[in-house]
């Protein structure tokens, strides 16, 4: 009766004590409750707890249950399979050639579509409005990248041209400066030759002019030489006798431009009028003196 009452009370309370469980399992014949409790306290719990109770006690800790351990081991596989299988990713829309052609035509004329036009194109091409919208967004980004890359290439080409141009200009300037120096040297050489020729010609001309002037002066002096003799009228016969080869001795004294009768002093005229005899040597000395005076006057 006590055993049955204990089991009923255990099921009613639903929280049986450890002593009642040990009593019901160790003494099924029907020992007293006190004796069974004393005996169970003296025994070790490892020898008295059956395997089903160990499983129930172990089951109270969810972390050590094998079912939970298997679920924990399989969860990484599910995480790994998820991204690999691609079930979570959105499927990419596959456009046909006709759809792409029509979309490219529309993008060529209109890069931004209004909603009515987008709905119309989606109905014509058997697409959804969202698909058309996404395609135009992607196409605008692609066009922007292409334009940006093209601008970068053009700018790099321009910078390269600008970098190359100064070198070419420097080379051209260097070549031009060398050619200019060569031309300048050649021109200076030609000018030096021309000036040297002019100097030579000028020297020749001066020498010729000097020689011509000297000849003219000599001729004039030679012309004036015979006119000196008639300064002494009393000695005309001796001059004619000595210098018959000169035809200018017959000229009168008045035609001689240098000497005039008024230029003679009275003493000299008196001396000429006197009948003093003059030798030919004295007369020659006198005529030479007069000719030297005449040459000095002509030179100055």
Curated annotation (Swiss-Prot):
Keywords: Developmental protein, DNA-binding, Homeobox, Nucleus, Transcription, Transcription regulation
Record PROSITE patterns: HOMEOBOX_1 (PS00027), HOMEOBOX_2 (PS50071)
Location(s), subcellular: Nucleus
SUPFAM superfamilies: Homeodomain-like (SSF46689)
Superkingdom in the source lineage: Eukaryota
Region (Disordered) location: 59-90
One MF term in the entry's GO annotations: RNA polymerase II cis-regulatory region sequence-specific DNA binding
A cellular component annotation (GO) from this entry: nucleus
Residue spans binding DNA: 88-147
Record-annotated membrane-spanning stretches: none
General function of this protein: Sequence-specific transcription factor which is part of a developmental regulatory system that provides cells with specific positional identities on the anterior-posterior axis.
Family, similarity comment: Belongs to the Antp homeobox family. Proboscipedia subfamily.
Protein name, as recorded: Homeobox protein Hox-A2b
Biological source species: Takifugu rubripes (Japanese pufferfish)
